[in-house]
Amino acid sequence: MTTILSIQSSVAYGHVGNSAAVFPLQRLGVEVWPVHTVHFSNHTGYGAWRGPLMAPEEVRDVVTGVEERGALGEVDAVLSGYQGGEQIGEVVLDAVARTKAANPDAIYACDPVMGNATSGCFVHPAIPVLLRERVVPRADLITPNQFELGFLTETEPGDLGSTLASVDAARDMGPSTVLVTSVLRPDRPKDTIEMLAVHHDGAWLVRTPHLPLTANGSGDVTAALFTAHLLETGDAAVALGRTASSVFDLLRRTHESGRRELQLVQSQEEIANPRMQFAVERVR
């Protein structure tokens, strides 16, 4: 059974961070050990929230407790998302190092959350530097959106060629696999959005309809599903197709519900067995 140590935020109401990643992974049959970096009432997109931000030493202590059970050797991947500060980033890197010492075959999957093309960069100014210089070089898999890819590599991905060049620059930094979770190239068909996966054996693109929806947590679900499918199959193209199909079904159901939060529980069957099967195109 695949086991993932997921170090992310958590909310009581809604689905972001671990509250978005854990259930879909479990629905796929993955054992998930969540370590929370915050436990808020709701995500910060509402403009107001309550609850504690975990101190770095508290997060480290939870990982240490897992290590003391002799369990880190069972971990196949460490998954991280939004990092609220530099110290949390260092705790994540320490957890990765300890996990890989216990299981050299384990991978580190990093969702380098920084912002998007609409909102710009919305994290502390130190975070992009931390990600670029310390975190991404230690990752085996990263899942940026197109904006974050450009920020990390100090490039300007636009069309397919420039986006592939930016991915190559990211892979030169350390990760062997890059999933670009939202590619908005100017020459794509109208009302569509794409994902691009690049692995050591090629590059693949998948296109889905672009729904008129802004859903907090969708990137967290995407990173989790792709990590799980890649661990299971070892095939980036298969992982890409499965992930895009499940995420589209989730977003479609969320859009149809008229609700702001992801309809994760309501979409559980589509997460495991997506209704839509989108074709994956080899682009290199």
What do the predicted segments below correspond to?
Residues 1-117, 121, 268-281:
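Conserved N-terminal subdomain of the carbohydrate kinase-like
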Residues 2-7, 200-211:
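Glycine/charged-rich beta-loop-alpha catalytic/anionic-binding loops adjacent to active sites
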Residues 11, 38-40, 84, 114-116, ...:
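Glycine-rich beta-alpha junction loops
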Residues 16-20, 27, 54-61, 87, ...:
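Conserved active-site and cofactor/substrate-binding residues in soluble primary-metabolism enzymes
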Residues 123-203, 213, 233-237:
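Conserved phosphate/ATP/ADP-binding segment of small-molecule kinases
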Residues 208-226:
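Short glycine/threonine-rich catalytic loop with a Thr-x-Gly-x-Asp
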Residues 224-232, 245, 249:
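Short glycine/serine- and small hydrophobic-enriched flexible loop segments
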Residues 237-284:
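Charged C-terminal helix
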